[in-house]
Design a protein with these regions (language model features):
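ATP-dependent phospho-/nucleotidyl transfer catalytic cores
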Residues: 1-43, 52-55, 59, 148
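Active-site activation/catalytic loop segments of kinase-like enzymes and analogous catalytic loops
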Residues: 2-11, 71-108, 121-141, 153-160
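Secondary-structure capping and boundary motifs in well-ordered enzyme cores
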Residues: 38, 43, 67-68, 116-124
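Hydrophobic HxD+1 residue recognition
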Residues: 46
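Activation segment
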Residues: 54, 58, 66-68, 84
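Conserved active-site aspartate in kinases
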Residues: 62
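Histidine/acidic-rich helix-loop-helix segments that form or flank divalent-metal centers
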Residues: 108-117
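ATP/Mg2+ or Mg2+-diphosphate-binding catalytic cores
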Residues: 132-181
Length: 181
């Protein structure tokens, strides 16, 4: 509801409540799949701007949003960070390494394909939420710097939904809203 309110309603200026509700309903199966997975402690705001250097050591900051989430949450948050573009080769290498190093008891997936499917769902949810956050910041602070991140995030979503027949309806609604508004 947050992203639909700030991105669709306030940023795009669309007041059609039925359309907003249908967009939320498109995300319901994704959220249901994610919420049925094994949960672990997650940072929930794990991106490049929250990783700092102190001397020769990395420090992670901004823990106030820590909650339970699936193991892919922080991974998708970092690798699909809207503040920088990690190339696909490195993204895939890091996903594969994460899957192989994390004990199966923690991630709970039977194979890498299942891990990837949940990663994709997490990417969609996390990046869509980021779109809402950028729209919120723009709306309340009038900070134009965040407008470029909305576009960057929408392109990430478009790539993630490419060749995904199960997401055709969501893709059509979301991108008709964004690119035709």
């Amino acid at each position: 509801d947050f992203t639909v309110d700030y991105f669709v309603g306030r940023f795009l200026g669309i007041d059609d409540e039925g359309l907003k509700r249908s967009l939320i309903e498109e995300f319901y199966p994704i959220c249901k799949r994610l919420s049925s997975q094994k949960m672990v402690c997650t940072h929930r705001d794990f991106h490049s701007r929250n990783i700092m250097m102190k001397g020769d050591e990395f420090m992670i900051i901004d823990f106030q949003d820590a909650r339970l989430g699936i193991p892919q949450y922080d991974l998708a948050s970092l690798l699909e960070d809207c503040y920088y573009d990690l190339n696909e080769e490195n993204r895939e290498l890091l996903k594969r390494m994460y899957f192989e190093k994390l004990p199966k008891e923690v991630h709970g997936q039977k194979d890498y394909e299942q891990f990837q499917e949940l990663y994709r769902d997490m990417l969609l949810q996390r990046v869509f939420k980021a779109v809402g956050s950028f729209a919120y910041i723009y709306h309340h602070r009038k900070d134009h710097r965040y407008l470029k991140y909305i576009g960057f995030a929408m392109e990430k979503l478009k790539l993630a939904m490419l060749d995904q027949p199960d997401l055709e309806s969501l893709k059509t609604k979301l991108f008709n809203l964004y690119y035709d508004s």
